[in-house]
Structure formats: structure tokens, C-alpha cells
């Protein structure tokens, strides 16, 4: 929902105009905002084309993949002629069954029991991820 705001696009235009090559930004493109799915509230697609139109180099990644995030940051540092936007396509609440992709959790904290359950699920997921990368 942040990119519904004019100040985001004013900054995008300025950075593109002046070719601020020391700017690397990351958009968490999770497709939700506090009021619901972003495309229902205020459609943004094609987001990549919008940033490119303002003179930015755009890298799109799976933002739930930490290695992809690290790789994209490395690639971004190697680009010297313009600002960089990394669009990280994410699933909000990834790994927590009762939170995953549910916009209601975007602005609501879990209660104590929900937090315990979420942390347990994330710890279990973390062990699986570590095992895949060892």
C-alpha cells in the first residue's frame, strides 16, 4: 500500500532524473495492504514497468528466498549508472499456516497463544531450510 502514495513516486522521479546510482531500494511486493489485496484497493501492476519508466534498473526476485535477496543485493551493487529497485515478491506470513497470505495480519498483532504457535511453526520451518542448505 505504500506505493499508493505520491511521495514514493516523487522520490522515484528524482532518483531516476539525477541517476542516483548509490540508491538501492527494495519493495516487499506481497500484494496486500491493511484494507485487502493491493490490486483491489489500488492496482499497481505492472510495477516493474513503472520503476523502469522513472529511470531505475529493476531486479525481480522471490523475496521469501534469502539467497535470492543476497544475490540481488550483490547484483545491484555492480550496477553503476542508475538507481536500483529490487522487487521482492513475497508471501506475507510465509511458514505460519494461519497467517500466510491473510491481509488481516498486516496490521494486527497475534495474541500470546497465536505468537507461540507461529514461533513454533517458524522454528520447524527454519530447521527444514537449514537442512536443505547443509
Residue ranges and their predicted role:
Residues 1-134:
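Glycine-rich ThDP/TPP pyrophosphate-binding loop and its adjacent helix/strand module
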Amino acid at each position: 500500500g505504500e506505493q499508493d502514495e505520491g511521495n514514493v513516486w516523487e522520490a522515484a522521479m528524482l532518483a531516476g532524473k539525477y541517476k542516483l546510482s548509490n540508491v538501492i531500494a527494495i519493495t516487499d511486493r506481497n500484494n496486500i495492504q491493511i484494507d485487502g489485496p493491493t490490486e483491489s484497493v489500488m492496482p499497481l501492476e505492472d510495477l516493474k514497468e513503472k520503476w523502469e519508466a522513472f529511470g531505475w534498473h529493476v531486479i525481480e526476485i522471490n523475496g521469501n528466498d534469502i539467497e535470492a535477496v543476497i544475490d540481488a543485493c550483490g547484483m545491484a551493487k555492480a550496477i553503476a549508472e542508475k538507481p536500483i529497485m529490487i522487487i521482492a515478491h513475497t508471501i506475507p506470513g510465509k511458514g505460519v499456516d494461519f497467517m500466510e497470505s491473510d491481509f488481516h495480519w498486516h496490521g494486527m498483532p497475534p495474541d500470546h497463544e497465536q505468537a507461540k504457535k507461529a514461533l513454533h511453526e517458524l522454528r520447524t520451518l527454519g530447521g527444514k531450510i537449514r537442512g536443505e542448505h547443509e
